[in-house]
């Protein structure tokens, strides 16, 4: 299940680095709950509809912006919806004006709606970030998907996820989150699996840290 949010923006400038503010909105709308600290079977996209203005170090939204929130558990989104109804204000003057439910897709090729983060644990609790062109990227992307399937109680052991850079724009990015520079991929992805598997990825996202704004797909 996925909610598409239509946001009012009257000439608003949103700083380039605003992902933490988006996470803050999600947590505000959730309120006290049992989801914090659990495996993040939800995802949310970047704000769209704006224009980058380098001189102002931000993104200009003339009239409106949109983004989506997806989750494998409908109760999660019901709580989000209640939170929005109680307090639709976001940040930088952005206000949610309308929420609609998006239809589920029936396909295997998807496109990024936020950068995809892949992390592999190294020695001394350090992590290596993998990018879409790395030789082990698809293996790690698939393992991550399998963990999400296990957490959601879906048995599809043959399911795979892979980057498909030839299907559209593919590039590397460096995303700052709380001062940490994350090497991430912006690339189409292909998911081979059952309809339930594809739906889980559509809602919960791919890769690591979907709960803080990475790995949403459309």
Feature-to-residue mapping (PLM):
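RNA-interacting cores
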Residues: 1-218
